[in-house]
C-alpha cells in the first residue's frame, strides 16, 4: 500500500490520543490539510454545533463507564434542552422501543415514535425486486419515518434497529439531530461489534476475500 493511501485506519499507535508516542510517517495529523482543518474548527463556532459538542463531552466525562447508552441519551437530551424525543424504530424492535419510550417518559420526556412499516407501502411500488417480498411485502419506509418526525417537531431523534441503508436514508432526511440507541444485527442480537471481536476465530470467514 502506498503511504499516501494510508490513513488513521492503518494506525496502531494512536499518538493523537495520549500524545505519549511518535506519530507514524503517514499520520493525518502531521500531514493535515490545514484548509480542511480550519473549515472544520470554524463549524464549532456555530451555536448548535458548540452546544452539542460541549454537551457530548460533558456526558462522556461525567459518567464515564458508569451510564448505559440509554442513560447517556437521556443525559445528552437534557443538556441540549430536548423535550420531545422521536423514535424511529424497526417494527421488529417495537417492543424494545416501547420500553425505551416508557423509560424516557418516566424521566420527563415527551415521546413520539414511527415504525418502519408505517404507511404500508408495497416494496414493488418503488422498484424493489419482487423476490425481496420473501421477507415481507411491505417496504421499510425510513424517509416517511423522518418526515413524520419532522412534522411532529421532535427535538432529538433516536434510531432503534433500522436496517443497513434504511438508517442512512433516515439520517439524510431527519431535520432534528439524531443519535442511535440500537444498531441492527439479526445474527448477533443487535451487537455487530461481536463479529469484529471474533474475527480471528469464529468469524474468521469475514477476512476471506471474494476471490477465495
Predicted feature locations:
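Electropositive, gly/pro-rich neighborhoods at or near active sites that engage anionic ligands
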Residues: 2-84, 91-95
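A short, acidic, amphipathic alpha-helical segment used as a generic capping/interface helix at domain edges
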Residues: 139-154, 162-166
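C-terminal functional extensions of proteins
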Residues: 179-212
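Short Gly/Thr/Asp-enriched flexible loops that form oxyanion-binding sites at enzyme active sites
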Residues: 96-103, 167-176
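Long, charge-dense
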Residues: 95-145
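Short, acidic/small-residue loops that bind anionic groups at enzyme active sites
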Residues: 110-117, 169, 173-191
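Short, surface-exposed connector motifs at secondary-structure boundaries
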Residues: 79-86, 148-155
Amino acid at each position: 500500500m502506498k503511504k499516501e493511501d494510508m490513513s488513521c485506519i492503518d494506525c496502531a499507535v494512536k499518538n493523537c490520543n495520549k500524545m505519549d508516542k511518535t506519530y507514524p510517517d503517514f499520520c493525518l495529523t502531521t500531514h493535515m490539510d490545514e484548509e480542511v482543518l480550519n473549515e472544520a474548527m470554524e463549524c464549532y463556532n456555530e451555536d448548535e454545533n458548540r452546544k452539542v459538542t460541549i454537551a457530548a463531552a460533558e456526558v462522556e466525562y461525567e459518567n464515564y463507564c458508569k451510564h448505559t447508552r440509554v442513560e447517556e441519551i437521556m443525559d445528552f437530551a437534557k443538556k441540549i434542552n430536548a423535550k420531545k424525543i422521536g423514535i424511529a424504530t424497526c417494527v421488529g424492535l417495537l417492543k424494545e422501543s416501547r420500553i425505551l419510550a416508557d423509560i424516557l417518559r418516566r424521566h420527563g420526556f415527551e415521546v413520539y415514535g414511527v415504525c418502519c412499516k408505517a404507511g404500508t407501502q408495497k416494496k414493488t411500488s418503488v422498484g424493489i425486486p419482487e423476490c425481496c417480498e420473501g421477507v415481507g411485502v411491505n417496504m421499510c419506509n425510513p424517509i416517511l419515518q423522518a418526515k413524520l418526525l419532522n412534522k411532529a417537531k421532535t427535538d432529538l431523534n433516536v434510531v432503534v434497529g433500522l436496517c443497513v441503508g434504511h438508517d442512512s436514508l433516515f439520517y439524510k432526511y431527519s431535520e432534528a439531530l439524531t443519535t442511535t440507541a440500537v444498531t441492527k444485527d439479526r445474527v448477533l442480537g443487535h451487537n455487530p461489534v461481536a463479529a469484529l471481536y471474533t474475527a480471528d476465530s469464529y468469524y474468521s470467514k469475514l477476512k476471506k476475500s471474494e476471490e477465495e
